[in-house]
Amino acid sequence: GFLSTVKNLATNVAGTVLDTIRCKVTGGCRP
């Protein structure tokens, strides 16, 4: 349903943001 789609999107965005922050903090960025 719509709510589950929104939840999945939010989870994906949160994961991407966390990965970006971790990448900047550790300096272990990979293209």
Curated annotation (Swiss-Prot):
GO BP annotation list: defense response to Gram-negative bacterium
Tissue distribution of the protein: Expressed by the skin glands.
Disulfide bond is among the record's keywords: yes
Disulfide bond keyword on record: yes
Superkingdom per UniProt: Eukaryota
Function of the protein: Antimicrobial activity against Gram-negative bacterium E.coli.
Protein name: Palustrin-2a
Organism: Lithobates palustris
Species lineage: Eukaryota, Metazoa, Chordata, Craniata, Vertebrata
